[in-house]
């Protein structure tokens, strides 16, 4: 099929399309919709390039009986055509803008629709909500038009092409076009008609578009201004009703603008998403629009909504599903929004394109602030050879090739969603540099809609400030370090509000720095918040493995090139929306109430209301429990005092502390007081826990007077330590017990610094591998032992080393074994600070496979780390080895428990228990560290025939360095010198 080559012509973005308008569905006066959904099963033909498409497939009499069928909407890769591809930065095609490969996969779609005689006389429009990447449209064999911009809507008037009765619609979709260079988003690349297609039948004259803007007046009044644009002669009548359908005021028409004044207006916020209903009626049509009265502005470098300093607790969200790909239903979107609301999110950035047009309607209704982002990302230019240019990302922009396209995409985003109160910020796009095109697009945006904020992070790449950025209201960064944030606010002079449009990269086991960033968000009024990268793991469901696990595919699993591996697996939830532990960390860090201990003896606490618009007493109920080493002392509920947003109130908990050496912890749990559409009453929104009494250092169990010392037998390498019912082999070469036998079962020990790298270890991993940490070993310099009346004491000086490079650490270890077989270990270590920080330092125990029962006194029940433990609390927990495993799709270090006092693994008869004078990190797994390190998918994992148990002096934090900053020093196992004492009982 010979096509006009619009798809490689940046000067021809659209042919035959209607002027942009806001999204709405018109109804007749009888309240019947004027929209017909054309979605369903369409005829489909897949071809390797446009020239292979039959030229007559567009004709009504074309025999399409041999064509396949495909659901519309859908992505054709999800139905067996073409192949999936995941790439982040790199373009999937040769870089030759505006040209794309000649072998350009093409999908030919056909369907029919029927018009009555009356409908055929009206005006008819086709409305495409989303097509990737570009498409040509024919009706009844006649060319209607062409459009692109995958995630924005395109509308065509087809009145002159339709007939009474059956009409044939043919659409040809191309995989790539010149717009592909502007749609280089970090996602799986898919194609097709992936959103709904609507047929609109409208009267000869109608309301074409309208604009709603709201303002606040002193005294609590709200103003709603509506401008209406008509196609033809109409006399619109406007009414505004409250949520109970009662009219509120009358519209006053001045200079073509309708204005409602609402006394004592109920304001829209994410916490209180109150909506009025605007109705625009003509003789033949009715249009309704939800209206939220709210105002957003900046004063003195601070973002305000309705007069209150606002903090965004947000996430970046792609349209993504492991089965349906880009095609997302309302039910799927509501599933996401439900989880977000339940995990304390209040904001969404539509990364990096407009979501389905009804998505902002849902955000209006359920209460989310939205950064509405245009369908632009061009960071693939970074892979080209232009390293001498400061503004590499902006080269495509500066060249002028896509100047018109950038403006077009920004306009389509803004105009479509302009009437939604949830949209506080327009984002011009993502990672596409800053040049003339963005300067012009930014100016247009601010002029068109001065009532909202304008955002664009990539303006920071214009280091020499060659271009005007005055229209940008926010200083936006990605993954700025905590030091950079402090530096920004330390500078003198006026400044824009600071926002992290992406931060705390949530890939795999992580993120681990949420609390550190949140402390800064609350410290600086001008830090208006951040958006986690990102909401969900992107993957393709490839079926079920023999072991019953879902096989999720990511980059490289589809035979594609180029690809970026599992970098798409970077969400807070799994592809099926099962929460990662990281989203629990987020939930509790951004909890709506934060307590601080004022008086531990009286158990008086100050409760701070972290909500922005709601009195704490109206939103929260509070329960408490106090435990001593996991044993319940008391529990109850406390009345929540009336507390305005961002203020504190004190409460006293009726707790009598026992005289005990145990750790006494008070836990406060915050629950929702009333139901929200997405959150039930009584839903836990967070907790705080405080140590009321206890000892940082505990004395370990001492030897009883009647104990008899074990015997020691020397060999050429091993010391055999024997006592009643046990035999231990101590390796004088390595400085640790090679075997511990008791009750017919044997375990072994080794020093351990290696862990299966997490996704967030991907950068430091190179240093660890260069340092050969994965080949570490120990050798002793000296070993001595002594036997007194009750114990055996073995002392070794040890070098922790590896091949090729220098010593990692040197330490003295003292092992004390009593007659009952209890082992006490004391280590005095000095680390070589020329070497990278360690993944961990501790001991690894290899246990019998039958030992599957686990109990521990420490932080749980979720996995937790030194920088990711706010999701957990200190308590006594019981579990199983299987349940201690967090099944990341790409296997990695997991299942750690921070700040443990005690941990036991066994089978009910035999087992091992660890104690520490201070605390330790603990984990146990059916998989070896090596297995977790080398396997690419969780369904490939094979269980060991033993159980691996780790006791660590310190396990380094997980951070977010897969894309974010380096792990903060305080969370690294970088101690220059340290002492550690622990005890093992069998």
Language-model features, listed with the residues they occupy:
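Surface beta-strand/loop "capping" patches
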Residues: 204-232, 580-619, 702-716, 827
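Intrinsically disordered, low-complexity Pro/Gly/Ser/Thr-rich segments with frequent PxxP/GP/PP motifs
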Residues: 255-263, 630-661
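Extended substrate-binding grooves/exosites of carbohydrate-active enzymes
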Residues: 1-30, 181, 186, 285-606, ...
């Amino acid at each position: 099929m010979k096509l006009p080559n619009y798809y490689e012509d940046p000067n021809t973005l659209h042919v035959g399309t209607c002027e942009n308008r806001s999204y709405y569905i018109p109804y007749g006066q009888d309240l019947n919709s004027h929209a017909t959904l054309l979605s369903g099963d369409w005829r489909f033909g897949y071809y390797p390039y446009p020239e292979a498409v039959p030229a007559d497939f567009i004709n009504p009499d074309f025999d399409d009986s041999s064509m396949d069928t495909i659901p519309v909407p859908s992505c054709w890769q999800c139905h067996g055509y073409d192949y999936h591809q995941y790439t982040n930065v790199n373009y999937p095609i040769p870089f030759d803008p505006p040209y794309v490969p000649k072998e350009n996969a093409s999908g030919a779609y056909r369907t029919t629709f029927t018009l009555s005689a009356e409908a055929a006389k009206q005006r008819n429009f086709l409305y495409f909500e989303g097509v990737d990447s570009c498409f040509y449209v024919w009706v009844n064999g006649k060319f209607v038009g062409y459009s692109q911009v995958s995630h924005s809507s395109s509308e065509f008037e087809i009145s002159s092409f339709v007939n009474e009765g059956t009409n044939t619609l043919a659409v040809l979709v191309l995989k790539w076009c010149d717009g592909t260079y502007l749609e280089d988003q970090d996602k799986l690349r898919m194609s097709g008609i992936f959103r709904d297609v609507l047929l609109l039948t409208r009267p000869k004259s109608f309301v074409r578009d309208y604009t709603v803007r709201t303002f606040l007046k002193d005294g609590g009044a709200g103003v709603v201004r509506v401008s209406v644009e008509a196609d033809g002669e109409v006399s619109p009548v406007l009414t505004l009703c409250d949520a109970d359908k009662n009219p509120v005021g009358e519209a006053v028409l001045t200079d073509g603008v309708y204005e409602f004044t609402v006394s004592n207006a109920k304001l829209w916020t994410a916490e209180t998403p109150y909506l009025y209903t605007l109705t625009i009626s003509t003789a033949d049509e009715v249009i309704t629009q939800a209206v939220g009265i709210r105002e957003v502005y900046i004063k003195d470098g601070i973002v305000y909504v309705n007069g209150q300093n606002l903090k965004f607790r947000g996430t970046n969200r792609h349209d993504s599903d492991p089965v349906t790909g880009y095609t997302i239903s309302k039910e799927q979107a509501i599933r996401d929004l439900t989880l977000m609301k339940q995990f304390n999110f209040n904001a969404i950035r539509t990364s990096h394109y407009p979501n389905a047009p009804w998505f902002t309607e849902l955000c209006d209704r359920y209460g989310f602030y939205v950064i509405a982002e245009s369908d632009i990302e061009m960071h693939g230019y970074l892979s080209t050879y232009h390293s001498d240019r400061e503004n590499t990302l902006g080269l495509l922009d500066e060249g002028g090739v896509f100047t018109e396209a950038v403006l077009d995409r920004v306009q389509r985003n803004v105009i479509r969603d302009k009437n939604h109160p949830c949209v506080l910020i327009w984002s011009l796009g993502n990672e596409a540099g800053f040049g003339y095109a963005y300067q012009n697009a930014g100016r247009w945006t601010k002029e068109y809609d001065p009532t909202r904020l304008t955002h664009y992070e990539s303006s920071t790449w214009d280091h020499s400030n060659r271009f005007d950025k005055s229209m940008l209201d926010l200083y936006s960064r990605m993954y700025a370090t905590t030091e950079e944030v402090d530096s920004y606010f330390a500078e003198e002079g006026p400044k824009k509000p600071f926002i992290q449009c992406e931060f705390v990269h949530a890939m795999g086991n992580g993120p681990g720095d949420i609390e550190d960033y949140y402390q800064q968000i609350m410290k600086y009024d001008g830090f208006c918040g951040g958006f986690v990268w990102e909401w969900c793991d992107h993957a393709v469901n490839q079926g079920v493995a023999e072991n019953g696990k879902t096989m999720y595919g990511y980059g490289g699993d589809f035979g594609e090139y180029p690809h970026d591996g599992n970098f798409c697996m970077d969400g807070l939830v799994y592809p099926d929306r099962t929460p990662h532990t990281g989203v629990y960390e987020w939930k509790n860090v951004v909890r709506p109430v934060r307590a601080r201990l004022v008086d531990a003896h009286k158990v008086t606490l100050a409760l701070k209301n972290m909500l922005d618009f709601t009195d704490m007493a109206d939103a929260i109920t509070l329960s408490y429990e106090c435990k001593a080493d996991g044993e319940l002392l008391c529990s109850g509920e406390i009345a929540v005092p009336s507390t305005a947003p961002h203020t504190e109130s004190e409460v006293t908990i009726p707790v009598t502390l026992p005289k005990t050496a145990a750790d006494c912890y008070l836990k406060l749990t915050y629950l929702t007081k009333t139901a929200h559409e997405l959150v039930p009453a009584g839903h836990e929104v967070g907790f705080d826990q405080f140590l009321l009494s206890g000892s940082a250092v505990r004395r370990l169990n001492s030897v009883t007077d009647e104990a008899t010392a074990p015997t020691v037998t020397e060999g050429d390498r091993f010391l055999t330590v024997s006592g009643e019912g046990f035999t231990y082999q101590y390796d004088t070469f390595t400085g640790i017990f090679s075997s511990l036998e008791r009750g017919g079962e044997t375990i072994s020990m080794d020093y351990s610094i290696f862990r299966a790298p997490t996704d967030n270890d991907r950068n430091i991993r190179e240093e660890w591998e260069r340092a050969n940490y994965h080949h570490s070993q120990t050798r002793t310099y000296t070993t001595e032992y002594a036997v007194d009346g009750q114990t055996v004491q073995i002392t070794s000086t040890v070098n922790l080393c590896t091949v090729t490079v220098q010593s990692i650490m040197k330490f003295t270890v003292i092992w004390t074994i009593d007659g009952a077989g209890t082992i006490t270990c004391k280590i005095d270590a000095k680390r070589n600070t020329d070497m990278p920080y360690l993944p961990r330092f501790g001991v690894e125990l290899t246990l019998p496979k039958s030992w599957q029962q686990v109990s521990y006194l420490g932080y749980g029940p979720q996995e937790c780390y030194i920088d990711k433990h706010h999701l957990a609390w200190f308590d006594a927990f019981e579990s199983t080895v299987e349940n201690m495993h967090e099944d990341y799709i790409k296997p990695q270090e997991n299942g750690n428990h921070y700040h443990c006092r005690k941990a036991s693994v066994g089978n009910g008869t035999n087992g091992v228990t660890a104690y520490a004078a201070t605390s330790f990190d603990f984990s146990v797994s059916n998989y070896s560290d090596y297995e977790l390190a080398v396997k690419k998918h969780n369904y490939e994992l094979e269980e060991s025939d033993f159980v691996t148990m780790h006791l660590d002096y310190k396990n380094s934090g997980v951070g977010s360095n897969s894309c974010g900053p380096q792990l903060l020093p305080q969370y690294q196992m970088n101690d220059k010198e340290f002492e550690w004492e622990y005890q093992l009982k069998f």
